[in-house]
Amino acid sequence: MKLPKEGDFITIQSYKHDGRLHRTWRDTMVLKTTENAVIGVNDHTLVTEADGRRWVTREPAIVYFHKKYWFNIIAMIRDNGISYYCNLASPYVLDQEALKYIDYDLDVKVFADGEKKLLDVDEYEIHKKEMHYSPDIDYILKEHVKILVDWINNGKGPFSQSYVNIWYKRYLELRNR
């Protein structure tokens, strides 16, 4: 499949392990694609939940997806600084319809002051039993929490202020042309 180009808009679909559609983001603007990664931006993007509820993202957010890592990263650009929401999730696939991944419940939130919080551990444990996550998936996800925390602690990739600044500036250039 042909990769989307800078300035193209794509749909992002999050699924659960059992194949159910979990959440959809419409019209994420692509900022960069490589063989292994997609960087995009959501800004007042329509989000549809599995139960049909809809909402719109409040602030611009740089989104990062990778084919080798079991997480994706959302850098939310707010008045008080950058906050991050990181989903533990399968590496993405991209087809004609959307960028797709499986959401594995665990999330890491990083506040603008640097505080980190692991979220939804109870939900993960429940879904692990209900949806029969394999021991391999459980191991991979726990290892990727460690990798993610290392990225956070070392300001790697999306956790670098300059990374967010560069991609937000590029978004503004594309939006205003």
Swiss-Prot record:
Mg(2+) 2 binds at residues 105, 107, 120, 123. The keyword Phosphoprotein does not apply. Keywords: Hydrolase, Magnesium, Metal-binding. It holds the Pfam family DUF402. This is Nucleoside triphosphate/diphosphate phosphatase. Mg(2+) 1 binds at residues 87, 103, 107. It comes from Streptococcus thermophilus (strain ATCC BAA-250 / LMG 18311). HAMAP family: Ntdp. Its cofactor is Mg(2+). GO terms for molecular function: magnesium ion binding; nucleoside diphosphate phosphatase activity; ribonucleoside triphosphate phosphatase activity. Its EC number is 3.6.1.15, 3.6.1.6. NCBIfam families: PRK13662.1. It catalyses: a ribonucleoside 5'-triphosphate + H2O = a ribonucleoside 5'-diphosphate + phosphate + H(+); a ribonucleoside 5'-diphosphate + H2O = a ribonucleoside 5'-phosphate + phosphate + H(+). It is an enzyme of class 3 (hydrolase).
